[in-house]
Regions:
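Short, charge-patterned binding micro-sites
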Residues: 83-87
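Extended, alpha-helix-rich binding/interface surfaces that flank or overlap catalytic cores
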Residues: 57
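An amphipathic alpha-helix adjacent to DNA-recognition modules
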Residues: 62-69
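N-terminal core-binding DNA-recognition domain of tyrosine recombinases/integrases
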Residues: 89-93
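Structured surface interface patches that mediate subunit assembly and partner/cofactor docking
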Residues: 2-23, 27-30, 37-50, 70-82, ...
Length: 242
């Protein structure tokens, strides 16, 4: 009698969480597609909920992505970098979006090449490459939302992206809501069921398990870098309105 082994069903391994470089690459393409759809509209209008125009918000976004790469390269212990790269103020919006792609690619390449043990200063928590990737993804998601909402282009940050950002940068975020709605609430952009819209906010970029650092360098507020920063725009250094 030939015995056949009983079939066994293997338990599938849990799916690996997406890598931050993959999330940043996807966020870049998603944001650029939405912004390109709005390229022919009036970018002199104020971005949703911000004091900046849509054009100035785009400049802030490119500056922030470049700055995150610079922080990981220079690795300062107590200050922001001294290089600030912004978009040509005379350039057309489609050309500015090319500049945004350059800034995002620069950030992505730097993050990919940075060893995991590296730390760099940020006013909202000294962080690692994954933390700066999460910040870059957040900047893309939030400011694409700000611009597209102001210009009437339907768009919302992807739920998977928002869930990853919340887990990395907002460990105390409320549960029981959609990730996108929760991220917008955490960053002062919308109310959440049972919770009023936040007036002030910040994320926590510190690496879990690292020893806390005390003190805030001179010239830095609790909500970002000096000299000016809107409380709802994120921590990249603000671009003064032209």
């Amino acid at each position: 009698v030939t015995m056949t082994p009983s079939a066994t069903t293997a338990t599938p391994a849990p799916a690996a969480p997406p890598r931050w470089t993959d999330l940043l690459a996807a966020a870049t393409e998603d944001s650029l597609a939405a912004l390109e759809e709005a390229a022919g509209r009036d970018w002199s209008r104020p971005a949703h909920g911000l004091d900046w125009t849509c054009r100035q918000t785009l400049d802030h976004l490119a500056l922030g992505l470049t700055g995150y790469a610079g922080l990981l390269i220079a690795r300062p212990a107590d200050r922001y970098i001294t290089l600030f790269a912004s978009l040509d103020p005379q350039a057309a919006i489609p050309d500015c979006l090319d500049g945004l792609r350059v800034a995002a690619t620069f950030a992505l390449s730097t993050i990919r090449d940075t060893p995991p043990e590296v730390r760099a200063w940020h006013p909202w928590g000294t962080s690692d490459a994954a933390g700066f990737a999460a910040m870059a993804v957040t900047e893309l998601a939030l400011h694409t939302y700000d611009i597209t909402r102001a210009l009437g282009v339907p768009w919302a940050p992807p739920e998977t992206t928002c869930a990853a950002v919340l887990a990395r940068l907002f460990p105390d975020a409320p549960s029981g809501h959609s990730p996108s709605g929760t991220l917008l609430w955490c960053t002062g952009r919308a109310p959440l069921a049972g919770l009023p819209r936040r007036v002030e906010w910040r994320w926590d970029g510190t690496v879990r398990g690292d020893l806390p650092r005390t003190g805030v360098p001179a010239g830095v507020t609790s909500c970002g870098t000096s000299p000016t920063i809107d409380r709802r725009t994120g921590p990249a250094r603000a671009v003064s309105p032209a």
